[in-house]
Amino acid sequence: MPEEKQKKSVLEKALKRIEENFGKGSIMILGDETQVQPVEVIPTGSLAIDIATGVGGYPRGRIVEIFGQESSGKTTLALHAIAEAQKMGGVAAFIDAEHALDPVYAKNLGVDLKSLLISQPDHGEQALEIVDELVRSGVVDLIVVDSVAALVPRAEIEGAMGDMQVGLQARLMSQALRKIAGSVNKSKAVVIFTNQIRMKIGVMFGSPETTTGGLALKFYATMRMEVRRGEPIKEGKDVIGNVINVKIVKNKVAPPFKTAQTYIIYGKGIDREYELFNIAVNEGIVDRKGSWYYYTTLKGEEVSLGQGSSNAVQFLKDNPEIAGEIERRIREKYGLLSVEKEEQRKEKKSSGEEAS
């Protein structure tokens, strides 16, 4: 027993010295209840994807990769995340490496263009330096880099068209992510990288698909989200959108490999009510009797949503209070935390620091 007390005393002194040298919080006991906090998130803008993430959205203080084929909805998902961050009172930035952002489309998705920070960098080094500076500022909540494939190293831009530039982009990403990863965690920002799929040549077994930018992003990303375009959504003979299939291929904050299906309407983004309706029917929250749909409120009142799915979806669009109640019930069922506004989150953080 005396030996154990001596060990404990020596350990306490060592921890105290570390905190004096490197600051409070540089080392801690994992089981200490004051240190273990629930994962804070920024919603994805899609209820189905929020459920698939297991925590209700993109985890704060982490790096996220959204990758997929062309026109699969990667930028749309990133813009929806920006809109959600702004709704919470947060600051968002869009690093437009592709120089292809459509402000009209972004506005239709709910993005506040007046408060959105945007940069169209000349080369990859500049883009990643801007990301690093924004993260270190500690006041930006969400940074989107669109896309990794467009982060062209300066040497490649300045070189001749036919010059061999082996592994430049991979080295650039590896060096940048080593710097960014630590400061992202401290700032509680979310950094989303969109990425494109390429085909590996000469692959006989396994998937020939890979993403650009080397392996560093795969390692540093807390969450990797694969996006694939599904069947078209039609209104009569006209194609008005696409079903989007999402798979969480890597997740460090919840069980991975969950899937989600969402619906993107051209020019408008995610059809939230259609998505909500389908989830509610699958979960038994909305009942189907023949071709009619009914919902029983928390007060016990049975409400007719209409005949056929299109009428039921329109009813939810016309009655946001009913739609909100259904969404809350679904989130409670999956144990997803209610999202706080940014001001409330910062107040809690500051009051916690004062108490400590």
Curated annotation (Swiss-Prot):
GO terms for cellular component: cytosol. One of its GO terms (biological process) is SOS response. SMART domains: AAA. This is Protein RecA. It holds the Pfam family RecA_C. ATP binds at residues 68-75. The keyword Amino-acid biosynthesis does not apply. GO terms for molecular function: ATP binding; ATP hydrolysis activity; ATP-dependent DNA damage sensor activity; damaged DNA binding; single-stranded DNA binding. Belongs to the RecA family. It comes from the Bacteria. It is found in: Cytoplasm. HAMAP family: RecA. The gene is recA. InterPro entries: AAA+_ATPase, DNA_recomb/repair_RecA, DNA_recomb/repair_RecA_CS, P-loop_NTPase, RecA-like_C, RecA-like_N, RecA_ATP-bd, RecA_C_sf. Keywords: ATP-binding, Cytoplasm, DNA damage, DNA recombination, DNA repair, DNA-binding, Nucleotide-binding, SOS response. Can catalyze the hydrolysis of ATP in the presence of single-stranded DNA, the ATP-dependent uptake of single-stranded DNA by duplex DNA, and the ATP-dependent hybridization of homologous single-stranded DNAs. It interacts with LexA causing its activation and leading to its autocatalytic cleavage.
